[in-house]
From Swiss-Prot:
Cytoplasmic side: 1-45, 96-143, 211-281, 330-372
Chain's gene name: Or10a
Tissue distribution: Expressed in olfactory sensory neurons in the antenna.
Membrane topology reported for the UniProt record: Multi-pass membrane protein
Organism (species): Drosophila melanogaster (Fruit fly)
Family to which this protein belongs: Belongs to the insect chemoreceptor superfamily. Heteromeric odorant receptor channel (TC 1.A.69) family. Or1a subfamily.
Principal localisation: membrane
Protein name per Swiss-Prot or TrEMBL: Odorant receptor 10a
Amino acid sequence: MSEWLRFLKRDQQLDVYFFAVPRLSLDIMGYWPGKTGDTWPWRSLIHFAILAIGVATELHAGMCFLDRQQITLALETLCPAGTSAVTLLKMFLMLRFRQDLSIMWNRLRGLLFDPNWERPEQRDIRLKHSAMAARINFWPLSAGFFTCTTYNLKPILIAMILYLQNRYEDFVWFTPFNMTMPKVLLNYPFFPLTYIFIAYTGYVTIFMFGGCDGFYFEFCAHLSALFEVLQAEIESMFRPYTDHLELSPVQLYILEQKMRSVIIRHNAIIDLTRFFRDRYTIITLAHFVSAAMVIGFSMVNLLTLGNNGLGAMLYVAYTVAALSQLLVYCYGGTLVAESSTGLCRAMFSCPWQLFKPKQRRLVQLLILRSQRPVSMAVPFFSPSLATFAAILQTSGSIIALVKSFQ
């Protein structure tokens, strides 16, 4: 276990932090794209089938509760069902774009570990972003794991409390998540196996969104690192000529070639960002919609079960997990946007006036292109910390408004 969680320690090698959480989560589920992405492990299809059964039975149970006008039970059922349904969509798209994800990961790794860009400050930038991404990614995974474990332990804890209070007449076993199951599976001797199966569907959801969302944030963090590495490269290019008033033809030629190399790499990073954003468009859009629904359902659950300590704890855990997932997407988008515009400021602060008019066009080209931030926006949503703050503000306002009517 300690070997798996080495990325939480300080002073580890870069390869320990690099895609640590997504690799761990997706590899367990069989969805890590690997070097080529042209093979589908059997466990990926098995986990897809398990979650598909869980989603279908959970949605059916939620609709049945709605039909009987049991609103509280319906919300308790549909809240995890919505998360699982979106996770099932993520699983399908991860398989659909498995080869593309592998290509993107290899291209990112090739750009990030280019031997021509191995200055100490550039290595520090890569290490800082990798360590930060690993630790932030671990937060939504651990929050989701706690939420799922709370759901799975709830029936056992209630049974223990009833047993200790000698309330045997009220003793009834029920499953962690409300699912429509054949009666034969809810009776002895099959009930323990049914309980384990239903509990496991929750962990499939947790590890899949931890891996899929973690892959998104890790990719954004390393795209940000690439932009910052370019900034460091530009500053190091001009550093020897800070005190010069004029450059020789040889110096101009060398600097021009380096400048062209920076522009080529800048274009490659932007192309990679767009390619990645296109593959994650549906996932990002579905995630924002589902997170909004989960937060809404959870708020209603809190307001209706406010006096129930265990119900309130489930609400808090679910809301923290949903907000953690949103934070991963929003912070990732902010990192990419801010670091891409930082390249413009770094270029402008250098003594670019040493160039001749012909070479200055390269500088103007880079400044013009980097003035517009590289966006991870999808239809209707733009992942950024401003969006995350607006969601928090809206959620708080709705809670305060509903509380005032009680």
